[in-house]
Amino acid sequence: MQFFSTRDQNRKVTSSQAIAQGLSDEGGLFVPESFPQVDAKALCGLDYPALAAAVVREYLTDYDPAFLTEATRSTYGAAFGGKAGYLAPVEGDTYALELWHGPTCAFKDYALQLMPKLLVEAKKNLGRTEKTLILVATSGDTGKAALDGYHDIPGVEIAVFYPTGGTSEIQRLQMATQEGANVAVYAVRGNFDDAQTGVKKVFGDKAIAAELEKRNIRLSSANSINWGRLVPQIVYYFAAYAQLLNAGKITFGDEVDFCVPTGNFGDILAGYYAKQMGLPVGKLVCASNENNVLTDFLTTGTYTAKREFFKTTSPSMDILVSSNLERLLYHVTGSDTEVAGLMKSLAENGSYTVRPETLAAIQETFACGWSSEKEVAGEIRARYEQDDYLCDTHTAVAFHVAAQKKRSGVPMVVLSTASPFKFPRSVLEALGRTAPENDFEAMQQLEAAAGHAAPASLAALRQKAERFDTVIDPAQIAEVALGYQA
């Protein structure tokens, strides 16, 4: 399996190269040359680690299959507490795919616990011995998951950049207290898009790359622009379908719809890949918060990033430039020149419009909707009072949209992307309770409401010392990168 850039089909690489490099030289994203076809029904009989190995090996064809089997087995075992890809019934034929039972309590763990192993193996496959400098822009969850996955990995340095005031206090503390000799964390003045743009500029700066190469350092990414982030996320769509099949809720071939709280479009795009591989996915429902740029695009075909930015209670979705949409545009149009033109228009004008036939093709699979802050709070309370189910703010966005888009007789799986204990004040307030200013006091009150303890890794943050408190401007991200030595 080869990969090529969404903006230049002539730039072909192996999966090892795609994972080690992260982003194509001209700024495009790597996509597979084809969609491998699998026996989805047979895969439904596997446990999660074996299922993960079976899916990722279809794309990572230059990796030793034995390595992938061992890597997935060691990744999705104890760290996920026996709940990797756990599907919880909520109401009728609506389910929650709980993706927050990993070490950092967010869905990003599924990729970022495996991805460090993939990077180290990629360098071995390529015969590369240089230091890898990973730059990560985060709206909250990716940063901690990447830090946890990559800390103290030999030959790797990682720097994470998050927007000041753009995460929950628990998310900030998860990053600021991170242990490890090879990690660094910076708050960036501005929003997530400012941080992400700053990181992308570093990746696209040939002078920076040349200077780092002199020091035997190469840049890479742990954001979902890196193929190594996307491929592990395909797996849990198969896992959700398998659980419904094995429980007798569906027969093989029945469609299942998925509603995904969406920011950077990577998680929902993984569902598109699962569908293209042969999994009977029906509709993929893109759920946005008040930063509803994707809802507008999927409705009109015009993407407009120049708009008011809202800080919401679902900060991991507070994004106006949704990077992975570029991959979908390539798959639908099949044209690197067309995609390059659209991305050029976005960079220069802040917007682009796709052809009507492109929008129609996208709408065959993708539906969309968005939730206001009031609706998010109402959804948290409704699920708690009506279904005895406690969810976080991002999941509530998806529950609200899922109810609007639910098809009669078709199961709906809502991707639950983070633990409610990562956002204790917002969840408590949604339940109609007065939340204390201190997040840990709020967490204790939420434990009483939930009837069970908060994840140990979150509760332990209260005792940890903060290591990182530097605040920088987006333009200083380049200075940070150039400050590294081999």
Model-derived features: positions:
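PLP-dependent amino-acid enzyme catalytic core
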Residues: 1-486
